[in-house]
Amino acid sequence: RNVKGDILNGRVRSTNFGIWWDGDLLRELLDHERVLKYDWKAGRTYTLMQLKNCKFNNGTKSNPCLSADILGDWREEILTRDEASSELRLYVSTIPTTHRITCLEEDIPYRLGVAAENSGYNQPPETGFYFGAESKF
């Protein structure tokens, strides 16, 4: 709905995890072993990556073990377990980016969010600064 209460699109979208994945400055959606891109112009989502042979946690919510800027290129990686829970897997975007941004772990609110995600409240970390499509980095 918009600010007037008008319905903009009647289809329900994923609202599970946001993740910086594909190289632009918009967040993608991480939900049930898939990274999804929301095309706001077309009003639909499409799959960027299907994570194979892995398991997420908490059945209905489907949380990864961790999603964060682990490797330091500002885009976030996905840490999960395999189906047998015998190994950890780190999924990394292979999509090129032209943006050069400081490692998100250097931002204190982001780092605290990663610690909270990893130790209790499993929600994606947020930066302490505005990070969006029109940002100039």
Give residue spans per PLM region.
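Beta-propeller-forming repeat regions
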Residues: 1-137
